[in-house]
């Protein structure tokens, strides 16, 4: 008689229940229960506080022929598994709390309905031990509580998050009926299920034995890393004498452990839906393990707190975020699934709630989809849409692909096109005439506005004029904010202001009027 297992098979020991990854022994059961198709998982990874646009944005290139930006270099080797979306977001600029809500709720005013992850979890999370996981890196930011949540329930209320890897591990891989004192006495969860594992290994074929061995090794490594975190060298320290009491001893290892647990939970089908915040929007984390002494939020305002040193520190933090995205993709690629890798049959949504980290623009929001989603999307592409696209259109498209019966979401009633290779309207710059005029101390320039790519002049904008030196825009924060210069970047404008001629280059130092050539309006602040 042959041994048959289903996807809900566990290795069991006293006080422990360990879910299994896919084995060939399960194939007959899988064909019976889901038509032979592997389950598709949905994972979101949130990056706080936006980006430095010149370091993030892709300028030029086509759908299939494009060069990834400097901030994308940590995960550039995954290019063929990525769908990079550009011109995502609504008009104007936003508060930290509203931009955070937008990330998974389509619009900041969508406050009475579930977030997209919860709607997808309702569809795909009913057959797993855990309907969904909501994870974070930081505690609550009480000044603006909305900065701390991206997941919302059916009433529009925040879904509680978990930030402790040990509690997540217990929730996923320990029997909840086991007494906590007994749990702590276990040297290793694997010891508790060792006999069951050996018995299964004797009955399994060679390929399954290799997969099972790899799986148990991963669990053992993860548990050991959790133990290392718990035994961090701070036992005898008088915390009242520390400058920053309560600061995590090893943030990098904590985050990577959480990513290990997410990948493991998805791989074992413990859950099919997970969200993880790498920090609150308005994050006050100090990345001292990177040699940084200022809070992330302070550094994100690189215009008003401008210095080359501060910008370098911000970019170092942002690159760390990108490295964690890369870490997750590497983990998911390393795990075998029924018909490929875990990533092949997952859809990972990575991004932020705002674009320009200082001005909080709600345009050109960083947004990337990774994985094939079991054929839901076509990757290896860069889609820059002709006009700003509400994030709700993306959410609507994703929900429909996951089988959610929904025709509109937030303020969007049309799904975002192009994700699966279907036609979409790409960005094409309209023709315009560029020129510059100077009359006394007044300068008027018409052309494409851009933010300087020189990291030594992060506050400087330029208007490109055909056949002439670019006009330099060198203004105080008030003009930067009131005229929403960050919003108009990359578009054609006519700008008038007072300025001077510096050795043949015209420099505008005070803006008096700004007009979009094609009717782009920043709108009002979204809170």
Q: Model features per residue range: what roles?
A:
Residues 440-457:
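Structural detector for short beta-strands of small beta-barrel domains
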Residues 502-523:
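OB-fold/S1-family single-stranded nucleic acid-binding modules
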Residues 428-441:
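Short boundary/loop segments of OB/S1/cold-shock single-stranded nucleic-acid-binding domains
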Residues 66, 476-483:
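N-terminal post-signal-peptidase region of extra-cytosolic proteins
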Residues 457-475:
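OB-fold (S1/OB) nucleic-acid-binding surfaces
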Residues 480-494:
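Short nucleic-acid-contacting surface segments enriched for D/E, G, S/T with interspersed K/R
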Residues 1-430:
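Ligand-binding pockets and gating/stacking loops
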Residues 444-449, 490-499:
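OB-fold and OB-like beta-barrel modules that bind single-stranded nucleic acids
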């Amino acid at each position: 008689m042959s041994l048959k297992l289903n996807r809900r098979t566990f290795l069991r020991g006293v006080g422990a229940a360990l879910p299994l990854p896919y084995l060939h022994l399960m194939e007959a059961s899988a064909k019976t229960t889901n038509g032979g198709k592997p389950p598709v998982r949905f994972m979101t990874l949130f990056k706080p506080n936006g980006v430095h646009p010149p370091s993030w944005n892709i300028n030029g290139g086509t759908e299939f022929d494009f060069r990834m930006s400097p901030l994308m270099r940590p995960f550039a080797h995954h290019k063929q598994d990525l769908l990079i979306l550009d011109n995502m977001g609504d008009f104007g600029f936003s508060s930290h709390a509203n931009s955070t809500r937008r990330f998974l709720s389509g619009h900041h005013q969508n406050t009475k309905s579930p977030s997209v992850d919860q709607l997808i979890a309702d569809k795909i999370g009913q057959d797993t031990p855990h309907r969904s996981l909501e994870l974070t890196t930081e505690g609550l930011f009480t000044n603006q509580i909305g900065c701390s949540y991206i997941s919302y329930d059916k009433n529009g209320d925040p879904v509680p998050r978990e930030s402790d890897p040990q509690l997540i591990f217990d929730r996923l891989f320990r029997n909840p009926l086991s007494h906590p004192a007994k749990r702590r006495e276990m040297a290793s969860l694997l010891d508790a299920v060792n006999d069951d594992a050996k018995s299964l290994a004797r009955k399994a074929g060679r390929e399954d034995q290799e997969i099972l061995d790899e799986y148990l090794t991963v669990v053992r490594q993860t548990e050991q890393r959790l133990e290392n975190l718990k035994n961090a060298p701070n036992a005898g320290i008088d915390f009242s004498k520390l400058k920053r009491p309560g600061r995590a001893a090893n943030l990098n290892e904590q985050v990577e452990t959480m990513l290990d647990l997410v990948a493991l939970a998805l791989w074992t089908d413990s859950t099919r839906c997970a969200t993880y915040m790498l920090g609150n929007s308005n994050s006050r984390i100090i990345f001292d393990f990177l040699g940084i002494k200022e809070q992330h939020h302070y550094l994100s305002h690189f215009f008003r707190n401008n210095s080359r040193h501060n910008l370098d520190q911000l970019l170092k933090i942002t690159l760390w975020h990108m490295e964690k995205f890369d870490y997750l993709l590497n983990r998911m690629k390393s795990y075998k699934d029924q018909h490929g890798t875990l990533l092949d049959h997952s859809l990972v949504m990575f991004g932020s709630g705002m674009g320009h980290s200082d001005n909080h623009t709600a345009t050109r929001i960083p947004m990337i989809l990774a994985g094939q989603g079991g054929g839901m999307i076509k990757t290896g592409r860069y889609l820059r849409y002709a006009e700003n696209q509400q994030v709700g259109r993306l959410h609507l498209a994703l929900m429909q692909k996951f089988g959610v019966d929904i025709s509109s979401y937030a303020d969007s009633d049309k799904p975002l096109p192009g994700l699966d290779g279907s036609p979409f309207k790409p960005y094409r710059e309209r023709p315009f005439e560029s020129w510059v005029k100077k009359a006394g101390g007044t300068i008027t320039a018409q052309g494409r506005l851009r933010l300087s790519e020189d990291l030594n002049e992060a506050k400087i904008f330029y208007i490109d004029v055909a056949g002439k030196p670019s006009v330099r825009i060198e203004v105080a924060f008030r003009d930067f904010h009131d005229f929403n210069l960050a919003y108009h970047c990359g578009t054609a404008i006519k700008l008038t202001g007072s300025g001077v001629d510096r050795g043949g280059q015209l420099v505008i130092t005070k803006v008096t009027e700004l007009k979009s050539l094609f009717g782009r309006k920043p709108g009002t602040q979204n809170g």
